[in-house]
Amino acid sequence: MSEFLFLFRGGDGHALQQSPEKWQAHMQKWVQWMGGLKEKGKLLGAQPLNPSGKTVTGSKKVIADGPFMEGKEMVGGYLMCIADNFDEAVEISKDCPILEFADGVVEVREIQQLPSM
């Protein structure tokens, strides 16, 4: 088994465009999807991220506001899971509710295991 990180992008603007009832129904799909992963022993953790933040860049440690909501590459949340292999992790990601939106993206990354220190 390996650990994987899913990074969620896009879909943020849809909250403003939908009725509260439709948005609640969409959020319930997240609860069901993650609940199913938990029942199967696949879910390690997941959280949404606040839209505001700071970036620290380079050896001079330049601090800037960001990322910004209007950026297409903004990470809105993450999920960590376990899977037998990369292909299984990708299959798991295909059921993510963010993919209901045309701009929804799930980036799947395998977490490297470092040797014990």
Locations of regions flagged by a protein language model:
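Conserved, structured core segments of small domains
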Residues: 1-117
